[in-house]
Each structure stands twice: as C-alpha cells, then as structure tokens.
A protein has these predicted regions:
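Recognizes extended acidic, P/S/T-rich segments that occur
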Residues: 229-267, 279-287
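Extracellular calcium-associated, cysteine-rich motifs in secreted modular proteins
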Residues: 674-700
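Acidic Gly/Asp/Thr-rich repetitive segments characteristic of extracellular carbohydrate-active
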Residues: 298-343
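Extracellular beta-rich repeat passengers
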Residues: 491, 502-674
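Extracellular beta-strand-rich solenoid/capping regions of secreted or surface-exposed proteins
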Residues: 211, 331-339, 350-367, 375-393, ...
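Right-handed parallel beta-helix
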Residues: 363, 368, 388-399, 414-425, ...
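Compositionally biased, intrinsically disordered or flexible polar/acidic segments
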Residues: 20-191
Length: 700
C-alpha cells in the first residue's frame, strides 16, 4: 500500500470530521448539454468523453481520470429532469463497453485525506456485479452500485480515507469489475452515508414556501441514527462551526426529522445543519444548507413565477441608446456577465435588432416601465429570456415581415415572470416557453401574428399566424389577451420526459381569446388546469363550438388530462355557446397515432394550486381588457385598437394575401388609430444626465 495506511469504506464506520484541504467537489456531466441542466449546484462540472484519459487542476491538485478504454459521458435524462433534478447522480463518465476507471490525485499535502465516490448506473442496464475499489493497486472494498437512483441520498457511494506521505506522491483510486459509472467525487469531506440528506427546503432554495415567515425544516435521516442535533441561524460560518454550547445557533437534540421555525423574512438568507447521532453516541457532522423565503417579485405577481428574484440587490444598468449592440445597448445590458442587475432605460423609441437577442444571464430585472416617452419597442428580431430568476415587465415587440422569427419567450427559463408585454406581427409564433419551469406569463397582449407571410419552413401561401406554444413545469398563463391570431391560441407543448412519458404541467386561467380562425387551444400536456377563460369568436372564426381540443396523438407513454371549469364561449353574434355553467361545453378530445385512451381525460378537481386570485370568466374578461399589454409608460395606438376591437367584436382590416378579417399578412395591412400603416411613431426621447446622477435606480 506504500504510504497509504488507513482505509475506510461505506458502511464500515461513521464519518470523520475532516479538516484536510482542499475540499473539492466534482460532478461528471453529460456532454453537449448546458451546465445549468446537468451540473449539481456547488460542484465543479467536468465533461469527459471521447478520450481515454483527461487531466484537470483544481485548487492546486492535479486530477486525472482514465479508463481501460475510451471514456464516454452518459446520463439518465429523465432523472436529471423534473421532478427529480438528480443532476449529480444521474449522469457520469464510463468506459465504452464497460471497464475500469482510475482517478489519480497529485500534489496533495502530506497527511490524511478522504474521498467520496458516487456510483449510480445510468444507462438502464441492471448491474449485478459489485465494483471493486483499489487504492494504489490494493483492493480495499466492493460496493454494489445503484441503478438509476433518483436522488443523491439514494445513490451508492464508496468512502475511503488515506494517508499521503508527501506532496510529490500520487494516489490512484481504481474502480474495477464490469460496468462502472462514476457520477462524481468529493475530496476531503465527511462520509455522506452517516449524514442527514434530502433537506427541505432544498439547499440553495431562494423561493422557499412559507406562511407569514413560518416554515418547517425536514430531512432524511441517516441509517441507524437515534438523535438529530439541529443548528439554525443567519451566519453560515457560525452554523458551520457551532457546537451544542452555541446557544444562539444550537436548537437542541431531537428524535424527529423535522423542525419548525418562525419569524423568517425574505430579506434574509438562513443556514442550517443537522448532525446525526447513532446509538453509540458517535456524532456525524452535517453539511450546511441554506435557503431564503420566497418573496413576491412585485405587487401583482402571481402564479409559479411569482417569486422570481430578478436583479434585486445587484447593479443598476441603464440602456442609453437604441443600438443593436455595444456600450449602452439593451443587448449589452442583457448579456454582460456582471452578475445580478436591474436594467432601466434612459431612452425611449424603437430598437431594430439585427439578430435574436437571448438574455441568458441569471437574476435580471428588465424594467421597461422606466423608459420615457412611449417606452421601448423592438422590431426585426426577437428577444428571449432563458436565464433563471428573471423579471421582465412592460416590453413591446412589433416584429414585422421579413426573417422567420418569433417574438418573445421563456424557453428553458426557471423561476421567471413576464408581465405586461405586447407582442405582434411575428412570423413563426409570438411566444414560446418549452422546457421552462416555475414560470408566469401574465397580462400580456399577443396579437396579429402575421399569417401568410412566407414562413421559411412552409410552402408559399401557407398560413402560420400563430400565437403561442406553451410548456412548463409548472407554467402559469393568466390574464392574457390573444387577439386576431389564426391559431395556437394556445398550443399546449408539454412534450415528453426522458423516459418518453407525457410531460408538462400548465395552469391556464382567466385569459381572453378573440377572433381565431381554425385553431383554439389544442395540443397536450400531462396535467392542465383550464379555468375561467373567455373565448370570443370573431369575423375570421371558422372553428365554432370549442375552447379546448385535447389531442392524444400516441407520441408518448402515460397520460394527459385536464381540469376544465367555468370557461365561456361567445359566438360572433353575441350569444353564449357556453356560459360557463356546464363544464362539458366547449371541450373535446381526439385520438390519433394509435393512442389508446386508458385513463380519464377530464379531472374533477385542480391538479395543483394556482397561487393566484382566480376569477370567474366574466369577471376576468372585464379585468383583462382594462389591464393588459405594455401599459407603462403608455399604451400605444396598436394595443388600444386591439383591446377596443376585442371589446366590440370588430376588426379594422383584412389580410392582403389571405383576405381574412382581422388577420394580417403584413404589418402594412394594419392601420393605427391615426391611420398610419405598420409601425406607428415611437419617438426617441433621452433623459437628462442628472435624472439619476448616482446611478442607484432612483431619480434625483
């Protein structure tokens, strides 16, 4: 064994409290994926694929991973995704065709070190063999890997401690025998098998649910423990170092695995730790977890994106010109890697984008209401919001005929909210939120998607005036107005999870839809609340009698079902086809693709809470028409007209190609209230330099 004289393996002893350094945590990631999708928070991502050996250097330690053959990245996609989000243990590195993996550490300081290895098979093949663990060619243990465990606490681990005789000595840890998937490792940490796991609220949850500051902490106890010591406070270092003598932080010893706290505030981050005590009195120190109680992003924010953090506490960044890119532009403000920010505007007018603008940074607020004049209008290319914890308010997109683009989107977003936006004259579709989670789209006006506008993926003359394809887990879509769009009002794009099961949970309530052509709400998702929506036929409407048409297309496994309640359908003449009292009215489903319906498609109660005030359809109709679209700093002529046409059941133009009432094919088909075709004037106004001289976001 050379200089290695101490080995400890999972299940043979309690954890040691290590003071060795450095502490290194590595997550072997799936290749070709965004780090936010596959990397466990607080771990260093490492993608190893297509090579037999790869080096990295972390905190002065050289780490090499090598295989008996070519290494490849692999994953269990469904485990990485919702609802498990097991990003640490549901991907990893393995040898193509099976074989040994060796980790070699160089430049470690002399003394005792520990290594924790995660061994969870991800490829779906049941592994019957145990994995032999060697240290410097000496077999120390055999560990049976788990197969597609869906949490870190459930995954198999190996834990060893070893002595290093000097800084020039390398230590090799070899995993041998059969199929080995190495998900990640942790150097110089306690034994996870003896620690509490599965914290709730989850570690780093900055949207923790609470009732007036009260919430319950809970965890999964380690095996064979009899007591738990709870530490709780607002100083991470104090919680980490605390002992039972620290009365301000130590909350006592208990047998249960939950602890109630009160008096918390969203303005504070909280830290807690649970030490496990076994029957012999051995204490295993726990990790320090943190959370922050959820806080409503702004007054009126509702639904699953209501607690988006946005740029709170970060920098204030001003947009000072209407350029596509460069200093002072919206693009630079969105994409610069400067951390949390609130984007405000010293300029108003029209920004003509030369290409798609993707706002991919986390913790960003875009405050369109701070612009002078008529606010900010974007044309020619779309703007999308893919970061997490984004708050976007009072923005306007009027795309126009040209390249095949959409308008706005929350695709892939997390804990984000888009509020009081206006989107029109798009060619692909106005809005999309596929792959997002914890989202809200509210009080947004989607109108006049260009219909026969030479979409690049379709034959000439094909209509594609579509409002939105929505997905999410969970996505809230409420108090929006969809007017003069031929179809996809909404298209439900729940998609499939990594196992091929129907996915997506959507909360669709209190929306107003007016003057569609042949498609209302269709498509499908796993669970949908569809409540209190108001559908009003117009002069272009050819599909009568429906608000929701569920399509079971045989593309996946599992089920798609709907809670359908209090939805109104008003015919073009003003009579009610469905007055909201009969929940069998206005809905249907269709089967295709060999789909066998072996479940009940209509649920008798909501699938999940809405975290919003849900109105009746009639009340929502009045509410939406009085408060929708980019109303700040001012509602423009276009939106004023569309709202009035919805209210009065009218239209003011026909498409120049398709000839359909209220359904444009070019933006020049449209005249505003001042009889101007296409874009109305959006004058450029610039605030004086002394408007906010200290750049704190508050006018002087």
């Amino acid at each position: 064994m050379g200089c290695l004289n101490s080995i400890r393996v999972l299940g043979l002893s309690a954890a040691l409290a290590f003071a060795a350094s450095p502490v290194i945590k590595v997550d072997f990631d799936m290749s070709g994926r965004n780090s936010s999708e596959v990397t466990e928070p607080n771990y260093v991502p490492w993608v190893v694929s297509g090579v037999s050996s790869k080096d990295t250097s972390l905190s002065g330690v050289k780490v090499n991973v090598s295989g008996s053959g070519n290494l490849k990245a692999n994953w269990y996609k469904a485990g990485v995704q919702s609802p498990s989000y097991a990003r640490l243990v549901c991907d990893g590195v393995m040898v193509e065709g099976g074989g040994a993996i060796t980790l070699t550490f160089s430049n470690l300081a002399a003394g005792t070190h520990s290594l924790l290895l995660y061994l969870n098979n991800v490829d779906g093949t049941a592994v019957s063999n145990s994995i032999d663990v060697y240290v410097n060619n000496s077999k120390q243990a055999s560990v049976k890997p788990t197969n597609r465990a869906l949490s870190t606490g459930e995954a198999a681990i190996a834990y060893v401690t070893f002595n290093v005789g000097g800084t020039g000595i390398s230590t090799a840890i070899k995993l041998n025998t059969g199929t080995v998937t190495l998900n990640g490792f942790e150097l110089n940490v306690p034994n996870a098998a003896a620690q509490a796991t599965g914290p709730s609220p989850a570690d780093l949850d900055y949207h923790a649910p609470h009732e007036s500051g009260a919430l319950t902490l809970s965890w999964t106890a380690a095996k064979s423990v009899v007591k738990h010591r709870v530490y709780f406070g607002t100083d991470s270092a104090a919680v980490l170092a605390a002992t039972p003598s620290n009365t301000a932080v130590y909350k006592g010893e208990q047998s249960g695995s939950s602890y109630k706290v009160s008096g918390t505030t969203p303005l504070q981050t909280y830290y807690w730790r649970v030490d496990e005590v076994d029957a012999n009195g051995t204490v295993s120190a726990g990790n320090v977890w943190s959370f922050k109680p959820g806080r409503v992003a702004f007054e009126g924010a509702e639904g699953y994106g209501r607690n988006a953090v946005g740029g709170r506490g970060g920098k204030v960044v001003y947009v000072t010109n209407l350029n596509d890119d460069g200093a002072g532009s919206l693009r630079e403000a969105c994409t610069a890697e400067i951390g949390p920010r609130t984007i405000m505007f010293k300029v108003s007018g029209m920004i003509q984008l030369k290409s798609r603008l993707v706002c991919n940074q986390d913790y960003v607020t875009i405050a369109g209401q701070t612009a002078p004049g008529k606010g900010i209008t974007i044309k020619s290319a779309p703007i999308g919001f893919t970061g997490k914890d984004m708050v976007i308010r009072f923005m306007r997109v009027r795309l126009g005929y040209g390249a095949t683009y959409d308008g706005m989107g929350l695709t892939g977003g997390d804990h984000s909210i888009l509020d009081h936006a206006s989107i029109s004259w798009t060619i692909d579709e106005a809005f999309s939120s596929r792959g997002g989670k914890n989202l809200t789209l509210q009080r947004t006006l989607i109108s006049e998607a260009l219909n026969i506008a030479d979409h690049q993926n379709y034959a000439a003359g094909t209509g594609h005036g579509y409002a939105a394809t929505i997905g999410g887990d969970i996505g809230s879509f409420h108090h929006n107005l969809l007017a003069h769009n031929a179809g996809r009002n909404w298209s439900l794009g729940g998609g499939l999870d990594g196992n091929g099961y129907y996915a997506g949970r959507l909360d669709i309530f209190n929306n107003v839809v007016y003057n569609w052509v042949s498609r209302v709400t269709d498509g499908g998702a796993h669970e949908v609340n569809f409540v209190g929506n108001y559908y009003k036929e117009g002069a272009a409407t050819t599909l009568h009698g429906y608000t929701l048409r569920a399509q079971f297309e045989g593309t996946g496994k599992g089920s798609q079902a709907y809670y359908y309640h209090n939805n109104i359908l008003e015919a073009a003449g003003g009579k009610f086809t469905c007055d909201g009292t009969n929940d069998n009215c206005g809905r249907e489903y269709s089967l295709s693709g060999g789909q066998v319906l072996d479940w009940e498609p209509w649920n008798s109660k909501p699938f999940f809470a809405s975290y919003a005030t849900v109105q009746s359809a009639k009340a929502a109709y009045k509410d939406v028409l009085s408060d929708v679209g980019q109303r700040m700093p001012v509602l423009d002529n276009h939106d004023t007209r569309v709202i009035n046409e919805t209210k009065n059941g009218t239209y003011s133009m026909k498409g120049s190609v398709g000839g359909m009432a209220g359904i444009p094919d070019r933006e020049t088909d449209v005249k505003d209230t001042a009889n101007i075709k296409g874009w109305e004037p959006y004058p450029s106004e610039i605030r004086a330099d002394d408007y906010d001289s200290d750049l704190d976001g508050l006018p002087d």
